[in-house]
Swiss-Prot record:
Protein name: Metal ABC transporter substrate-binding lipoprotein SsaB
One GO CC term on file: plasma membrane
Native species: Streptococcus sanguinis
UniProt keyword terms in alphabetical order: Cell membrane, Lipoprotein, Manganese, Membrane, Metal-binding, Palmitate, Signal, Transport
Entry similarity comment: Belongs to the bacterial solute-binding protein 9 family. Lipoprotein receptor antigen (Lrai) subfamily.
Record lipid sites (S-diacylglycerol cysteine): 20
Record's function text: Part of an ATP-binding cassette (ABC) transport system involved in metal import. Binds a metal with high affinity and specificity and delivers it to the membrane permease for translocation into the cytoplasm. Also acts as an adhesin which is involved on adherence to extracellular matrix. It is an important factor in the pathogenesis and infection. May contribute to the formation and accumulation of dental plaque.
Signal peptide: 1-19
Upper taxonomic lineage: Bacteria, Bacillati, Bacillota, Bacilli, Lactobacillales
């Protein structure tokens, strides 16, 4: 009996110690800055700067369209609890069904106090024939120089909210900017070597304007932005007629859109689809393109490869 009593006390002590340890860890985790990012690209850039210093939640799932999204209860909860929220801005989450505008309003969050546009400072490009607020092209991250601006804005806000980890954020930012800068330089050299008559990136959505400007590669598309009609017969006909006047060797289709319209274009022009590329999302974890850096490297490699045919 004494032996049983001793074992019971020992078991109780171990359980108590384990519970206290878990409580301590939970308390430690709860002390971390709670950060929400609207999509996988912004979340990955944030992760590269913050590492394990924050508790990070990404709203729009990998592979989904961030233009028009319906937040889940978990997204609403995390946004309400967040110390800091990062969104793209320039008409991405606030255009279309304006899902982000509704989300932060319901969570009683204030702009430039609780939530910040990571695109602040980007040289904005507008939709074709437009130059007014609400008509911006949101895909600024497809220019690596803008990706660097995103990273700098994220680091700035993290330091403001969490000055105790300033040294970590600054160190990680420096290393990340150097990495993106090297890839940007490599990209410019690659596209300089492609013959001008072959230089045109053809995609479903007209989301490569920033890419085109940065790397001197004109773009063409079926529809301009995912909030409008996608892949109508007139849109397809217009692109087919344009391509028949060119020597473009390859077409591309985005990983987050229906590939059927581009397959029709390919059939009607006899121009092959060279590869799927990334635009609004990174890849699933463990797959090629599962970070912002690797997504951009994959795109640059596939596009230059396809146009060099």
């Amino acid at each position: 009996m004494k032996k049983l009593g001793f074992l019971s006390l020992l078991l109780l002590a171990v359980c108590t110690l384990f519970a206290c340890s878990n409580q301590k860890n939970a308390s430690s985790d709860s002390s971390k800055l709670k950060v929400v990012a609207t999509n996988s690209i912004i979340a990955d850039i944030t992760k590269n700067i913050a590492g394990d210093k924050i508790d990070l939640h990404s709203i729009v799932p990998v592979g989904k369209d961030p233009h028009e999204y319906e937040p889940l209860p978990e997204d609403v909860k995390k946004t309400s609890q967040a110390d800091l929220i990062f969104y793209n801005g320039i008409n991405l989450e606030t255009g279309g069904n304006a899902w982000f505008t509704k989300l932060v309003k319901n969570a009683n969050k204030e702009e430039n106090k609780d939530y910040y546009a990571v695109s602040d400072g980007v040289d904005v490009i507008y939709l074709e024939g437009q130059s007014e607020k609400g008509k911006e092209d949101p895909h600024a991250w497809l220019n690596l120089e803008n990706g660097i601006i995103y990273a700098q804005n994220i680091a700035k806000r993290l330091i403001e909210k969490d000055p105790d980890n300033k040294a970590t954020y600054e160190k990680n930012l420096k290393a990340y900017v150097e990495k993106l800068t090297a890839l940007d330089k490599e990209a410019k050299e690659k596209f300089n070597n492609i013959p001008e008559e072959k230089k045109m990136i053809v995609t479903s959505e007209g989301c490569f304007k920033y890419f085109s400007k940065a790397y001197n590669v004109p773009s063409a598309y079926i529809w301009e932005i995912n909030t409008e009609e996608e892949g109508t017969p007139d849109q397809i006909k217009s692109l087919v007629e344009k391509l028949r006047k060119t020597k473009v060797p390859s077409l591309f289709v985005e990983s987050s859109v229906d590939d059927r319209p581009m397959k029709t274009v390919s059939k009607d022009t006899n121009i092959p689809i060279h590869a799927k590329i990334f635009t609004d999302s990174i890849a699933d974890q463990g797959e090629e393109g599962d970070t912002y850096y690797s997504m951009m490297k994959y795109n640059l490699d596939k596009i230059s490869e396809g146009l060099a045919k």
